[in-house]
Amino acid sequence: MIDAVEKTEGKQAVRVLLVDDHDLFRTGLRNLLEEQGLDIVGEASDGGQAVRMTRELAPDVVVMDLNMPGMTGVEATRQVTTAAPLTRVVVLTISDQDGDVLDAILAGACGYLLKDSSVDELIRGIVAAAVGESLVSPAIAGKVLQQVRATAISPEAADTIRAELSDRELDVLKLIAAGNDNAMIAAQLHISPKTVKNHISNILMKLQIENRIQAAVYAVRSGLV
């Protein structure tokens, strides 16, 4: 089991806001995550409350359900990532519908997990989000890529993307889209993890996107992978 307390290289435990309209599920999830060393700073039962509490509490990660009354999880994700750029959103839902997954990612979610995920997978997803990584449930990753490929951008737009990025940044982008984490990218390109992080920051800035999952979407749509 990943030690969530140690995830940030000696820093404090990951601060998490839970968002789900089912009280019993939230309580069980809270107990589970606290047992693993995560700091649950609050709970919200709908999207609007999630946005308000994010502004107040500035959690590291928001664990977000999609299907809630009132504001949807997708819209709440969009507002959370706009209001608090340093807060990461991990979607935790029963929905494996292609449209829901892609909508959540494009809204700014940096992780998408199903509620039947293992405890290890859930903890990995939250910890990964807290340090700027991403995790999509393996059960739906392939479906997402198929949908992304079906909405490929024009060759002209793809050429523009290639022109914006350096050769090394293109290499990093391809490896992100192939599912590699920072350490794996560093090893394959024979550069340091810190250099990988710098390249990723430049890629996100140049493409005007929020996270590495969106970067992977760009890579697939532009035909890089």
Language-model-detected regions and their locations in the chain:
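Active-site residues of response regulator receiver
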Residues: 65, 93
